[in-house]
From Swiss-Prot:
Role played: Catalyzes the reversible phosphorylation of S-methyl-5'-thioadenosine (MTA) to adenine and 5-methylthioribose-1-phosphate. Involved in the breakdown of MTA, a major by-product of polyamine biosynthesis. Responsible for the first step in the methionine salvage pathway after MTA has been generated from S-adenosylmethionine. Has broad substrate specificity with 6-aminopurine nucleosides as preferred substrates.
EC number: 2.4.2.28
Catalysed reaction equations from the record: S-methyl-5'-thioadenosine + phosphate = 5-(methylsulfanyl)-alpha-D-ribose 1-phosphate + adenine
Protein name, as recorded: S-methyl-5'-thioadenosine phosphorylase
Residues that hold phosphate according to the record: 20, 62-63, 95-96, 198
Domain of life, per lineage: Eukaryota
Record's subcellular location: Cytoplasm; Nucleus
Pathway(s) where this gene product acts: Amino-acid biosynthesis; L-methionine biosynthesis via salvage pathway; S-methyl-5-thio-alpha-D-ribose 1-phosphate from S-methyl-5'-thioadenosine (phosphorylase route): step 1/1
GO molecular function, one term: mRNA binding
Keyword match Iron: no
Organism: Fusarium vanettenii (strain ATCC MYA-4622 / CBS 123669 / FGSC 9596 / NRRL 45880 / 77-13-4)
Pfam families from the UniProt entry: PNP_UDP_1 (PF01048)
Similarity section: Belongs to the PNP/MTAP phosphorylase family. MTAP subfamily.
NCBIfam families in the cross-refs: MTAP
Length: 307
């Protein structure tokens, strides 16, 4: 990335946040590498701007380009704020997950529609604090329109028996340790489908930033509830390596579809516009607003405080 331009002045509406198992996108032309500094610090990695079918796509490595950030250390606010600031409104996030259900086999993919938060407040999880308050709806944490696009791309996966499950509940645990066996059975009793350490607060922050957001989950193990084998890093790595081509095929197909839809209401997240802004403006009275907090909100939404 060292010889790429560090500025880019054209619209970038679509982003991929790559996690464990998807550290880069292949077959896309890199045209810039941005290193923004947000009011919440620097993002986890430079933001690569890639050209795909004539459409610009941003790629950010959630855990850093060397996987140096543990799940609780990921600068989620900086990641989402930096993407929003360059124009991104539509985010596809990739995550390796453990399966909590027999029918979701290692190497299967899941398009979750619900999430249960089992993080512990260690991770900063809102943009609206310190003198500005906002309460944003999160009943349906993922974007139904983006989920529909992902589901139509299942045909691009290869391999016997590999399935794309069209819904499910992802449990997000604190980590970085894996679950105890008792916890794993508890999550199953709650109706959890898969488990990871990354989807929150990322999805909550994307909602606050008025972005369409959908996670694609790739099962790498059966967590520790299953008698098959206890989860460990070696097992996760084995399945990720075996299925990395399918992960890249699926994400590539999704980007093909989204590139065709660039500038559409879905990609521009028109259906989320105003959700946060109304909540923030009506909650904190002008005399109670902290000037520094107002500047931070302005970074997300330029012109936010103008009447």
């Amino acid at each position: 990335m060292g010889d790429l331009p560090t500025t880019f002045d054209k619209p970038v509406h679509i982003a991929v946040i790559g996690g464990t198992g998807l550290g880069q996108l292949e077959g896309f032309e890199p045209i810039a590498a941005l290193n923004p500094i947000t009011p919440w610090g620097a993002p986890a990695s430079p933001i690569q701007i890639l050209s795909h079918k004539g459409v610009n796509v941003a790629f950010l490595a959630r855990h850093g380009i060397h996987h140096q950030f543990a799940p609780h250390e990921v600068p989620n606010r900086a990641n989402i704020a930096a993407l929003r600031h360059i124009g991104v409104r539509c985010v596809i996030a990739f995550s390796a997950v453990g399966s909590l259900q027999e029918e979701i086999k290692p190497m299967d993919f899941v398009v979750p529609d619900q999430v249960i938060d089992r993080t512990k407040g260690v991770r900063p999880f809102t943009f609206f604090e310190g003198g500005v308050v906002g309460h944003v709806g999160f009943a349906d944490p993922f974007d139904a329109g983006l989920a529909k696009v992902v589901k139509t791309c299942a045909e691009h996966m290869e391999g016997d028996g590999v399935v794309l499950h069209e819904k499910g509940t992802v449990i997000v645990m604190e980590g970085p340790q894996f679950s105890t066996r008792a916890e794993s059975h508890m999550y199953r009793s709650w109706g959890g489908s898969v488990i990871n350490m990354s989807t929150l607060p990322e999805a909550k922050l994307a909602r606050e930033a008025e972005m369409a957001y959908q996670v694609i989950a790739m099962a790498t193990d059966y967590d520790c509830w299953h008698s098959f084998e206890d989860v460990n890093v070696e097992m996760v790595g084995k399945y990720m390596k075996a299925n990395s081509k399918n992960a890249k095929r699926l994400v590539g197909a999704v980007l093909d579809r989204l590139a065709d839809l660039d500038n559409s209401d879905l990609v521009l997240a028109k259906h989320w516009q105003g959700a946060s802004q109304g909540a923030v403006k009506f909650m904190t009275k002008p005399e109670g607003r902290d000037p520094e907090a107002m500047k931070r909100v302005e970074y997300l939404f330029p012109g936010f405080w103008e009447e």
